[in-house]
């Protein structure tokens, strides 16, 4: 159904448009997207005729600053936080609304000899400011357009137009598939663009690596910074890491209450210690400690979830009651750290099939799942049962 990002980039380089679909839980919409430098009158006319939405021009913050594109409103209350600027027309246009004149405005925006005084405000082209970091910071069509233009080798600016049906309703996936077929356009998802960038770019920086003697044995500890959000992650490394055989790996998400305070509500602490013991016994391996407290919802929200569990909800229901998915963790940054450490093939210490899928999706080979069984007891029995029944964890529970 969907095309690859590589196929879409090739079409964009040839001046074609593609259809980009966002997440079902977000806007659940498709937009026509092209590189801004491909915004011919024919392209604009195609978008307004067959898309029927608003023609917008996503640009970088630097681009918006150069043209003095101020925010459209002082207080942005849009549900998705779309960063509209004041609308513009190129100064020599007439009304600015025709396909020819909208094309003229878009192309003028790319001319570095033009400045703010060369445009009238308001107008008929609606610039949008993409977040620095692109779809890795905000999974919107704005960021997707700028990312795609950059990845295609062009100026990081695009043209987008929402796609509506003839009756004025929003086109959903079945209609978008038909539109892509009718006009021979590539159809891609923002989720696939995120995965592509995580596979092909590096967003992590190793800051330091030192020796770390522990109660389990002698390790090296390497600290990494996620350059997108500033979060710090660490890897405990045992032995030499190379491609000659699969490496024993544990990807462990931070759990202050379990790892540090020995909470009985979860099995995180016992899993952490068991993993270190197994890596030490194996003589070689990596424990990657990721700052993803509470399966990604953070410490305060995890404690709020505990409160809801005291009122009778299970761990999944509590997350959903707070407005979160059952598991918000993303394994892309972890995969980049493992790649930086030289890991290509691994034996993964986990009971979580989603973790296996998450890491293999970023180009790492999981050649074996090594179970990580820890004791169950009165306090964590329901928690473990919920992980097994609702999250698909591969556990062997008593009764």
From Swiss-Prot:
Protein's name in the database: Riboflavin biosynthesis protein RibBA
Active site: 327 (proton acceptor), 329 (nucleophile)
Source species: Brevibacillus brevis (strain 47 / JCM 6285 / NBRC 100599)
InterPro entries cross-referenced by the UniProt entry: DHBP_synth_RibB-like_a/b_dom, DHBP_synthase_RibB, GTP_cyclohydro_II, RibA, RibA-like_sf, Riboflavin_synth_RibBA
Lineage: Bacteria, Bacillati, Bacillota, Bacilli, Bacillales
Cofactor: Mg(2+); Mn(2+); Zn(2+)
Region of interest (GTP cyclohydrolase II), ranges: 200-399
Binding site for GTP: 250-254, 271, 293-295, 315, 350, 355
GO cellular component, one term: cytosol
